Amino acid sequence: MAGVGTPCANGCGPSAPSEAEVLHLCRSLEVGTVMTLFYSKKSQRPERKTFQVKLETRQITWSRGADKIEGSIDIREIKEIRPGKTSRDFDRYQEDPAFRPDQSHCFVILYGMEFRLKTLSLQATSEDEVNMWIKGLTWLMEDTLQAATPLQIERWLRKQFYSVDRNREDRISAKDLKNMLSQVNYRVPNMRFLRERLTDFEQRSGDITYGQFAQLYRSLMYSAQKTMDLPFLETNTLRTGERPELCQVSLSEFQQFLLEYQGELWAVDRLQVQEFMLSFLRDPLREIEEPYFFLDELVTFLFSKENSVWNSQLDAVCPETMNNPLSHYWISSSHNTYLTGDQFSSESSLEAYARCLRMGCRCIELDCWDGPDGMPVIYHGHTLTTKIKFSDVLHTIKEHAFVASEYPVILSIEDHCSIAQQRNMAQHFRKVLGDTLLTKPVDIAADGLPSPNQLKRKILIKHKKLAEGSAYEEVPTSVMYSENDISNSIKNGILYLEDPVNHEWYPHYFVLTSSKIYYSEETSSDQGNEDEEEPKEASGSTELHSSEKWFHGKLGAGRDGRHIAERLLTEYCIETGAPDGSFLVRESETFVGDYTLSFWRNGKVQHCRIHSRQDAGTPKFFLTDNLVFDSLYDLITHYQQVPLRCNEFEMRLSEPVPQTNAHESKEWYHASLTRAQAEHMLMRVPRDGAFLVRKRNEPNSYAISFRAEGKIKHCRVQQEGQTVMLGNSEFDSLVDLISYYEKHPLYRKMKLRYPINEEALEKIGTAEPDYGALYEGRNPGFYVEANPMPTFKCAVKALFDYKAQREDELTFTKSAIIQNVEKQDGGWWRGDYGGKKQLWFPSNYVEEMINPAILEPEREHLDENSPLGDLLRGVLDVPACQIAIRPEGKNNRLFVFSISMPSVAQWSLDVAADSQEELQDWVKKIREVAQTADARLTEGKMMERRKKIALELSELVVYCRPVPFDEEKIGTERACYRDMSSFPETKAEKYVNKAKGKKFLQYNRLQLSRIYPKGQRLDSSNYDPLPMWICGSQLVALNFQTPDKPMQMNQALFMAGGHCGYVLQPSTMRDEAFDPFDKSSLRGLEPCVICIEVLGARHLPKNGRGIVCPFVEIEVAGAEYDSTKQKTEFVVDNGLNPVWPAKPFHFQISNPEFAFLRFVVYEEDMFSDQNFLAQATFPVKGLKTGYRAVPLKNNYSEDLELASLLIKIDIFPAKENGDLSPFSGTSLRERASDASSQLFHVRAREGSFEARYQQPFEDFRISQEHLADHFDSRERRAPRRTRVNGDNRL
């Protein structure tokens, strides 16, 4: 049974519950039930917990008891609810008799904001209980997503407040509030700032209630954004100041705004405007004939999804557009659908198929290999990716194929199976898919492919087909043999290389081909196991306290320790506003082996003794004799949850007071080291990740000096009171900061790895400093003044795609290597790439490549077509290598072999395996390759040239018959619409260009083509799909699991039609004269100009610890001649409600039928690098005009909660010379606006609608009709053109 969560495409699904039933369901779920939770971790046994729905926040929570919530998920993130034991979490306990729940008592919730969803696997006490949860949650899912924005804000505010107010006391401290605002991307400069903005404090404790918090939020949002250039704001703000609730926007004023500024034709109907306002506000006190907005509510509306720039009317499928042949559509297509991550070690998963199909994907791939018991398995052959059963995949496809869309699904079969297993495949196709499987043509007499409407709810097989009358035979393949295809590798897997600095062994991915050994940069040895990382066992529970921030060790002798503790607590609590119960623990000065708990209460520091004693040889800790703990950590943890009780008070331990000087004993800290001395030390450690921290001369200032990308860099750290600041990231201490960046990248991909001091230099330092790490020179010993810097030619690697804006610029893709770079001032460099010499490119789009290490003899000449692609670190020529096993092992590794090259004196590479068997197999195969390299390559080419096909499988192929691409057949009678061809992106690039693009488009008008990523994209990255789309390729297959720009463009393309997976290509592309790369060939299309101002944003996501400094990049992507991008300035330290200065951006578009408007929000970090925050991408033809919200999505194209931009956008047709037509949409809209203004001015003066006001109303009506006629005529001339000011219904 398919899960619920997405309505069936044909309207089927559970019937909607009645209002009374909904009320009963919500009450029952709010009370909650006890259910058994099955974990995804192998180490955790199933547990019974209380599950409840928190209606105020729209969350599911679970806990052992009533006091503490252990976990929660947002209902808005739920994608699907499945009845039964339909997750792997249940499978782990199949052999355990204690956990064999009835199928009917179980259900699974799938949720998340990424491609790979998380699971909540539950066992209820009865089938009725399961039905209650599924029915209730299904209703709540839809209701939560459809809720008006003010209600969503209310739920979000309560969620933030309750995350701090865990005891539900309806109060939080000012320190909690400051931390909370930081978490939502708003910088609070100091506590005074908060106190000035909060009113009605409870003076006794200084706590803040939810009402005060909500009012503060409303005030912060409005006061920060009242300066935006918006209708109503300028005059009303002058009148009301900081009090937006003193100014009301009436129904009539709001109606005029919708008509005059937004071009909303439906707003002519006053009753519709009234109905909209009531549904948006949902305020019982304003359910009156003349509802109104307060000024801040109007601004909230402008940022809301109800005011989206996207015309939601286009979300519906238009059946009339589904009658063309399949070859006239773009079809949403997935590559290696079964993978959840990279191409060499990730997990193959049934869930990946379900997820893709539910995202509207209509062409999925099955990579089939011979498996056990005569049935194929699916995985990425000859790699470490896990395997799934072919039969299980078919059942998953059957369940999910037509949930999101009823239009046909194409199964692209990559067949590596024997004849016998092919026959079993065919049998299972028929058995499992039944009537949905297409086995005969829709119309034998047709001269083209059938339409999506003709193939509704059908599944098509794409597979090679035999000639008529053959039982089986060898057929030619359309794919050339390549030893660089990882599927053709002789062996691949994880081996280990020793780090020459710390002598630890780190995993690398190795690939052995018929002539070479390739190995990757450091990778993860995890082979895609679905389990979460197992928690590490503590070395000893009695020592757990030593790493806690509240433990300060010995603070001083005698009473000094007491005085120091009192000073630390007093300074911390006064400066930060920390609440009562803030505490630290120190070693007792008086009683050896005991400790002292010092805490803050009512403005004073108090102390109590923590006793210790030995009990049967193990220490015990207690405050009172009747409650004893096994460790100091357990005691403190207990009193953080349960109050300390005495005659005078009850109080929980609340906030730990961090150590301020713990860094002084760390190996990386240097109290008196100059910048020059630090650089000299780091020059002797030629490894990225080497670092130290030094005290600077300025007060309360430090610096981290580190190596990254072969260079030495520095960044400042500032102590501000009790907080340590790195850029705009806050930490409690230097120790916390360093600990964080040992786990997370500090600069690009570099993590702090090797702490450097004199002792470390003696062990790992080189004799000669690497001066090239400090200056741009490459000659050791070459030393120059830092300013001016000499220019040296080097190589750089592209961080992003770049398309030339002028003839003297380079065009390149991400990861391209640009050679002979000459650095120039002004942010532009020159270099060689793609056969072009010394052209310009922006320097911030690239990073300089590090000098090749001595351990990589061929690093300078890396093969860009290697099977490891961008992951490649080194490559060795096997015939030139000698292999020797090291029987004694090396540095705690038992299974080690060495690779040496006689041609390179004194060079060898030590490689470790996980087992003796693995070592022997690698050594054996490498030696075999060394002896037979040339013969093996020839044999591989011969074997791949022809392939045997089973008749039973061939008979299932009706329309999608892959054949080698023959350019000579295009446009001739030999071209058959049932034949199709597949291309790796590298081969497709030979046809999607100015020379052959028009010819390839001609091919695609009749036949299907499928394009897929090149095999070297082992990181599952994607290519740019735009050139393939504009040349008519229908099946542009992408890695759906990868959150990159190509997938975001793919999601945008299929927005129209509600992600049904089929989008009709513009009629222009079916014009024989149309050339995809020549704008002069456009006929029947008017060019248009888009004018955009970015005004502000709300609720931007965070990226790491700091407050973001956002800027917005606006891009038009489409035909090559239309693509361009511009960007705003960045706003300092504000991701909650930033505002940008008014600056119009203009984009001229010649082909608006194939154009996308893309917004990307980046933050600029302390190194001036740009980091992705959010994005939104739309087809230009679906945009609305006026003051519009741009709802933002994450990199997986999932909606971010409440995140949006506010823009002012206008779209108008333009002649070639840029002049406006006198009857253009803009001119007509201006006339309509003038008529609207006159009408409202008359009504405002007189207050009634009498005969003498008939003329202004008639002028308004006529202008609106002219505007509508203008669009109708344009729609007739060019179907589905960009609407300038169409019926923009909310």
From Swiss-Prot:
The modification Phosphoserine is found at S1221, S1227, S1233, S1248, S1263. SMART domains: C2 (SM00239), PH (SM00233), PLCXc (SM00148), PLCYc (SM00149), SH2 (SM00252), SH3 (SM00326). PROSITE patterns: C2, EF_HAND_1, EF_HAND_2, PH_DOMAIN, PIPLC_X_DOMAIN, PIPLC_Y_DOMAIN, SH2, SH3. GO terms for cellular component: cell projection; cell-cell junction; clathrin-coated vesicle; COP9 signalosome; cytoplasm; cytosol; glutamatergic synapse; lamellipodium. It is an enzyme of class 3 (hydrolase). Residues 27-142, 489-523, 895-931 form the PH domain. SUPFAM superfamilies: C2 domain (Calcium/lipid-binding domain, CaLB), EF-hand, PH domain-like, PLC-like phosphodiesterases, SH2 domain, SH3-domain. CDD domains: C2_PLC_like, PH_PLC_gamma, PHsplit_PLC_gamma, PI-PLCc_gamma, SH2_C-SH2_PLC_gamma_like, SH2_N-SH2_PLC_gamma_like, SH3_PLCgamma1. Ubiquitinated by CBLB in activated T-cells. The modification N-acetylalanine is found at A2. Interacts with AGAP2 via its SH3 domain. Interacts (via SH2 domain) with RET. Interacts with FLT1 (tyrosine-phosphorylated). Interacts (via SH2 domain) with FGFR1, FGFR2, FGFR3 and FGFR4 (phosphorylated). Interacts with LAT (phosphorylated) upon TCR activation. Interacts (via SH3 domain) with the Pro-rich domain of TNK1. Associates with BLNK, VAV1, GRB2 and NCK1 in a B-cell antigen receptor-dependent fashion. Interacts with CBLB in activated T-cells; which inhibits phosphorylation. Interacts with SHB. Interacts (via SH3 domain) with the Arg/Gly-rich-flanked Pro-rich domains of KHDRBS1/SAM68. This is 1-phosphatidylinositol 4,5-bisphosphate phosphodiesterase gamma-1. The lineage of its organism: Eukaryota, Metazoa, Chordata, Craniata, Vertebrata.
